[in-house]
């Protein structure tokens, strides 16, 4: 079986690796000169199943309204001139009920926990090195109200069997010693000891090398134009004036997957949510975090690599704009210097932005389409690194006709089509017949 995978980010590369492990002939196509050049390039570095929480949650509509008028707010909305942006936001708001939150959180945790298990197995099998740390992650609360609100997530963690520790401010330094200097600013934290960290770009590029060793062909610098459909199947993919044919196809172009598949009549409910990061040279190990902390107020993560610190966060709904907003750099700098003063050479930091493919229910789109040989692996939002190995393994199983180890039917695009049948008129997820 020959499979063409479209995209060489962490999602496409893990998919290709698992397909090759299952005996498929695999070709990966990407416009970039090497793997992990776009959204996987400089993300926050967290592998955090326990923090797999839907953006669409009770209370978010009120918070979003407040953030619109707040300096250093974690969310910014800039009209991109399309009706789709507003339709997508409306669909997200429709998921901000307690019932939908519970359903979406369970699906996300299921995939994320499985993905972490797959990552650990892959690491044990291959010895892959990517500056990984298995010291857990710590969510920091600056106010008593945030600390109390964590009880809701704890109930879900209990139900899903996810270990955790709720720490008051005095105990924060027991897991993050450098916080001893700034714990007086904090109300407490929620620690998830099973979460991990690591450099996603380094992982992806080294996994691409391992996949190539299994026979995967990576064709970089490719002008991938379109898929060619014939009836209920895909017949090929047009690349730089030629058409390449395969038995199966996997679309993993991140935020660009929606536009790429639109000519086929598929409308993926994916929107590019812009995120920012700083990569800071380490100045003092004693002043730096030992793993990852997440500032709940600013929605900013601070992650320790070997000799670097990655600070990532923010969410900007502005279409496909990749401009660097200096105000967001100031926010990232403020958070890291406020919590970990003197930890790094902030003035020498690399400032970066990427587009995270987000769905209205925060759950990725993983699985089949109405085209018999076309599969999707996109829409992971801020959790692409966390969910990559599990998503890649699930898609590889589906493509090769094997049964996935976890329930996966409710991860597919069909969940949006099912919603359409329950309501009058077309909904996000599939175009109505013309």
Swiss-Prot record:
Its EC number is 1.4.99.-. It catalyses: a D-alpha-amino acid + A + H2O = a 2-oxocarboxylate + AH2 + NH4(+). Its cofactor is FAD. The keyword Flavoprotein applies. Signal peptide: none annotated. GO terms for cellular component: cytoplasm; plasma membrane. FAD binds at residues 3-17. It is an enzyme of class 1 (oxidoreductase). GO terms for biological process: D-alanine catabolic process. Pathway: Amino-acid degradation; D-alanine degradation; NH(3) and pyruvate from D-alanine: step 1/1. One of its GO terms (molecular function) is D-amino-acid dehydrogenase activity. InterPro entries: DadA (IPR023080), FAD-dep_OxRdtase (IPR006076), FAD/NAD-bd_sf (IPR036188). Belongs to the DadA oxidoreductase family. HAMAP family: DadA (MF_01202). Oxidative deamination of D-amino acids. NCBIfam families: PRK00711.1. This is D-amino acid dehydrogenase. It comes from Bordetella petrii (strain ATCC BAA-461 / DSM 12804 / CCUG 43448).
């Amino acid at each position: 079986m020959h499979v063409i995978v479209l995209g060489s980010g962490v999602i496409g590369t893990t998919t290709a690796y698992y397909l090759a492990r299952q005996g498929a002939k695999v070709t990966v196509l990407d416009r970039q000169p090497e793997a992990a050049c776009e959204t996987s390039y400089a993300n926050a570095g967290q592998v955090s199943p326990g923090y797999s929480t839907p953006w669409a949650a009770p209370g978010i509509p009120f918070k979003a309204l407040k953030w619109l008028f707040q300096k250093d707010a974690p969310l910014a909305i800039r009209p991109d001139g399309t009706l789709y942006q507003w339709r997508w936001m409306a669909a997200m708001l429709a998921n901000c009920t307690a019932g939908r939150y519970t359903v979406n959180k369970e699906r996300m945790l299921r995939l994320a926990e499985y993905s972490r298990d797959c990552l650990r197995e892959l690491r044990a099998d291959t010895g892959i090195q990517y500056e990984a740390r298995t010291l857990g992650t710590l969510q920091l609360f600056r106010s008593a109200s945030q600390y109390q609100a964590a009880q809701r997530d704890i109930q879900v963690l209990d139900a899903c069997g996810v270990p955790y520790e709720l720490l008051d401010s005095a105990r924060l330094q027991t897991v993050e010693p450098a916080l001893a200097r700034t714990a007086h600013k904090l109300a407490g934290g929620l620690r998830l000891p099973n979460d991990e960290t690591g450099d996603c770009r380094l992982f992806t590029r080294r996994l691409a090398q391992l996949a190539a060793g299994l026979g995967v062909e990576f064709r970089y610098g490719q002008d991938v134009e379109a898929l060619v459909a014939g009836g209920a199947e895909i017949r090929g993919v047009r690349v730089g004036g030629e058409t390449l044919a395969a038995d199966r196809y996997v679309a993993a172009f991140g935020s660009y997957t929606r536009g790429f598949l639109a000519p086929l009549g598929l409308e993926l409910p994916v929107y590019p949510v812009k995120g920012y990061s700083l990569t800071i040279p380490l100045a003092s190990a004693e002043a730096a975090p030992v793993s990852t902390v997440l500032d709940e107020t600013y929605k900013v993560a601070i992650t320790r690599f070997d000799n670097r610190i990655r600070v990532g966060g923010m969410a900007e709904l502005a279409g496909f704009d990749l401009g660097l907003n200096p105000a967001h750099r100031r926010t990232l700098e403020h958070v890291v210097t406020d919590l970990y003063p003197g930890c790094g050479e902030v003035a020498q930091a690399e400032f970066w932005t990427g587009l995270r493919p987000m769905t209205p229910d925060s759950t990725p789109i993983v699985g089949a389409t109405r085209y018999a040989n076309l599969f999707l692996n996109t829409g992971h939002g801020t959790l692409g690194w966390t969910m990559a190995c599990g998503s890649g393994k699930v898609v590889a199983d589906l493509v090769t006709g094997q049964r996935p180890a976890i329930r996966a039917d409710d991860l597919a695009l069909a969940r949006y089509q099912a919603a359409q049948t329950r309501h009058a008129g077309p909904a996000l997820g599939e175009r109505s017949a013309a």
